Amino acid sequence: MKKLITLILFVFSMVAVQAQDSLPDPNIPLDKESKTIKFSGVVHEKGTKNELFNRCVYWLNGYYKSPTRVTQIRDVATGKILGKHSFPLYTFDTVSNTNIKTAKVNYTFTVMFKDGRYKWQIDELEVISNKKVPLEEMINKNDPRYKKEWKSYLTQIADFIKSWSDNLEEKMKPEDAKKEKDDDW
């Protein structure tokens, strides 16, 4: 169901691809020190470091098809989970009136835990179509290699990460908070 919602978000974002130039610039965070793109958030949530770690593992198992292949580090002692994955990017084909998978994005995610809070981060993003393109190159519209579909790609990437982080934050809530929300009808 979660993946279906993410796919629907992608499809709706692709409807706007026809008018790529009219798309607003997506919010892509560039780290000024490292000059790399890093999406991140710190969330205050009830629970110990271990409880938050276990909730995240539960989320991983529901979110990813093969979570053990996705994660490279699952260290309870340090409170860190690190994984690598990818997702598709689409371009709208006006002839067939459909979205066509034209590229994929590789990314690395890290979730770190402390008592009462956790931090998530997505970085090392690279778009792969005919060749690997670091995301940092795609935000420079003055670059002679800039392609007009990159704006659509950046929008899809920002939408994916928003959906990913929203899903993580929802699953990281303690069970009693979820039940209270359900009971308030």
Predicted regions and their residues:
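Ser/Thr-rich, low-complexity intrinsically disordered terminal regions
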Residues: 19-185
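Bacterial Sec-dependent N-terminal signal peptides
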Residues: 1-23
